[in-house]
Amino acid sequence: MRCSAVSLGSGTIINAIATGFGSAFGVDLKIKADVELVDNCKKIINGISIDNPTLKPSLVERCVKNVLDHFEVDYSAKISTSGDIPIKSGLSSSSAASNAAVLATIGALGEKVDSDLVLDLAIKSSFEEKLTITGAYDDATASYFGGITVCNNMERKILKKDEFKEDIKVIVLMPEFQKNVDVNRMKLIKDYVEIAFEKCMEGDYYKALFLNGLLYSSALNFPSNISVDALEAGAITAGLSGTGPSYVALCYSEDKKNVENALKKYGNTVITKPSTNGARILY
C-alpha cells in the first residue's frame, strides 16, 4: 500500500495572527510525501526528509498517525518527504508537508479523498506539534487548492477564492535574518491589519500584500525598505511572507531580473510563479 502526493507552498497576502482573518496564494514550489503502509498491527511510524535528513520528522509522522487513527487502522508506516520549499522561510512549508502527508496516507489506504478531512487532519497535526498559532487555515487552503484564498482562520471558513488575473512572477527573498514570532507585538497592529484585509476582500491583493508586509515587518523588526526597494526595481507589490524572514515580490516577466537584482543583495532568491494547481495524488 503506497501513495505519493504533493502540496504547494504559499505566499502571504494577509497574515492572520493579528486579526484571525488571513489570505495567502499558492506558489509553484512543492513538497512531495511518499507513504508506504504495512499491515502488521504494530503502528510503528518512521519518517525522513530526503533533502534534510537531520530535520525532525515529527510533523509528518503525526499526520500519518492521525490519519490511521481516524480510519481506525493499526498499520505501520514509512513516510519520506522531499521538495523545493525552504524550511522555516515563511512559505508555508509546514502546511505543504502536512497536506501532502495526510493526502498520501489517505491515498495509500485507498480511502476517498475529502478536502475538509485532509485540511482538518493536517491542521490538527500542526497544532499538536505546536507549529501554528492560528491554525494557518489560509496557508493550508492556498497550499491545498492553489490560487488565492481569503479565510476566517478562527472558524476555518474560506470567505473567498480567486486567482491573479495577470501573468506574473514571484521573486522570493530568503535573507539570513533571525526569525522573530512576537505574538503580543503582532496583536498591537490589529486595527491597521484590518484595513489591509478590507483591501483584500475588495480584490485589491497587491495593496493588501504591501500594507500587510509593512505592518508586520515593523512589528517584527524586519526591514521595511526591502519592499520599497522591490517597488523601485519594478515590482507590482512586495512584502514580508508569514512571520518572515522571507519576502515575496510580484512582478511582470520583463521586470523579474531587475527585481531579483534589487533583492539578492539581502540574501538568496528564488524565482517562481503563482500556482492554481493545488495538492494532488501523483500515484
UniProtKB/Swiss-Prot annotation:
Keywords: Amino-acid biosynthesis, Aromatic amino acid biosynthesis, ATP-binding, Cytoplasm, Kinase, Nucleotide-binding, Transferase. GO terms for molecular function: ATP binding; shikimate kinase activity. Pathway: Metabolic intermediate biosynthesis; chorismate biosynthesis; chorismate from D-erythrose 4-phosphate and phosphoenolpyruvate: step 5/7. Its main location: cytoplasm. It is an enzyme of class 2 (transferase). It catalyses: shikimate + ATP = 3-phosphoshikimate + ADP + H(+). Pfam families: GHMP_kinases_C, GHMP_kinases_N. One of its GO terms (biological process) is aromatic amino acid family biosynthetic process. Its EC number is 2.7.1.71. GO terms for cellular component: cytoplasm. It is found in: Cytoplasm. ATP binds at P86, I87, K88, S89, G90, L91, S92, S93, S94, S95, A96. InterPro entries: GHMP_kinase_C_dom, GHMP_kinase_C_sf, GHMP_kinase_N_dom, Ribosomal_Su5_D2-typ_SF, Ribsml_uS5_D2-typ_fold_subgr, SK_arc. Belongs to the GHMP kinase family. Archaeal shikimate kinase subfamily. This is Shikimate kinase. The gene is aroK.
